[in-house]
Amino acid sequence: MKLKTRLILSGTILISLAACYFLVLLVLDLEITRDLMTDYVDPRPLQTSYHKLCVIVPYRDRLEELREFSPHMSKFLHNQNVSHHILIINQTDPLRFNRASLINVGWNEADRLGCDYMVMNDVDLLPVNPEVPYDFPGIGVIRHITSPQYHPKYHYEKFIGGILMLTLKDYKKLNGMSNKYWGWGLEDDEFYLRIIDSKLNLTRVSGLSTDSSNTFRHIHGPKRKRDYTPKKNDKNQWEIKRKRDHVSGLHDVRYLIDSRQLLDFSGTSVTIINVALHCDLNWTPYCKS
C-alpha cells in the first residue's frame, strides 16, 4: 500500500514538473515573439477598408498635365489611406475625342483589376484641399466631388462634370455613359439624366473649409483648344446631342486595346491603356473632325 502511494505521489510530482516546464517555454516564446513584433514595422500603407478605387482618366495629348497629375493624385490618395489604381485611358485613333466612351472602357479595365469603386477624374483638375473625400461612397450613392460651389469654373445647378465617384455596380446599373458624344462637352449633362431616371442618390460634396478658388487647381493651359461639340453650324448635332440616349452605353462601347503599359512619373506608376474607339458613321457621322 505504501509503495502504491509513493508511486502515485511520484507520478503527480513528475506531471507537475512537466507542466511547469512547458509553461516556462510558453512564456519565453511569447516574450521572444513580442520582442520581434516590437522591432517590426509594416512597410505597407494603412488601409482604412477593403475597398479599392480605380481613378479613371480619359486622356489624349496632355502629357504636361499628366506629369503633374500622376504624382499629385497618388500622394493625395495615399494621405487618405485609399487603396487605388490610376488608369489613363488614352485615345489613339484619329477620331474626335470621346470622353464618355473612354470612361466606359475604363470601367471594363477597373472591373478586370478588381476595383469596387471608381472616380472619373479629368487630368487637368487636381484636388488641393485634403478634406476632399475620395473614400468609398457606398452602394447607391453617386458623389459629385467637384460640386458647383467648389469647381473653379462651372457652377450651374445640374453640373456633374470634373470629378464624379460611384461604385462599379452602380455605373453598370446606369449602363455607363452615352457613346454618341464626340468632341468636348454635353456627355455629363446626359449622364445627369441617367442618374435622375435611376433614382440613385446623387450627393454633392459640401461643408469644406475652402471655396471655388482654392479647393481644386485647374491646370488646363490656354493653348489647349477644346473641340467643342456639337459644332455650332451643325443643327443635326444639336438635335442628337440634346436628347436622352436610351440606346448606347457601357454594354455596347466598341473599341480595340492597342496596348497596356506602365509609366513612371516622379516615382508614381500609372497604367496607360491605349485605345482605338470605333465610330458608327451612320449614327454619329460627326465623329470625324
From Swiss-Prot:
GO biological process entries: carbohydrate metabolic process; chondroitin sulfate proteoglycan biosynthetic process; egg-laying behavior; embryo development ending in birth or egg hatching; glycosylation; heparan sulfate proteoglycan biosynthetic process; morphogenesis of an epithelium; positive regulation of axon regeneration
Signal peptide interval: none
Membrane-crossing segments per the record: 7-27
Alphabetical list of Pfam families matching this protein: Glyco_transf_7C, Glyco_transf_7N
GO cellular component terms, semicolon-separated: Golgi apparatus; membrane
GO molecular-function terms, A-Z: galactosyltransferase activity; metal ion binding; xylosylprotein 4-beta-galactosyltransferase activity
Region feature (Disordered): 214-236
Annotated consequence of substituting residue 183 to E: In n2841; F1 adults accumulate eggs in the uterus. Embryos are arrested at the 1-cell embryonic stage. Partial collapse of vulva invagination
Subcellular location: Membrane
Binding, UDP-alpha-D-galactose: 58-62, 97-99, 123-124, 154, 184, 218-220
The family this protein is said to belong to: Belongs to the glycosyltransferase 7 family.
PANTHER family in UniProt: BETA-1,4-GALACTOSYLTRANSFERASE, BETA-1,4-GALACTOSYLTRANSFERASE 7
Protein's name in the database: Xylosylprotein 4-beta-galactosyltransferase
Gene: sqv-3
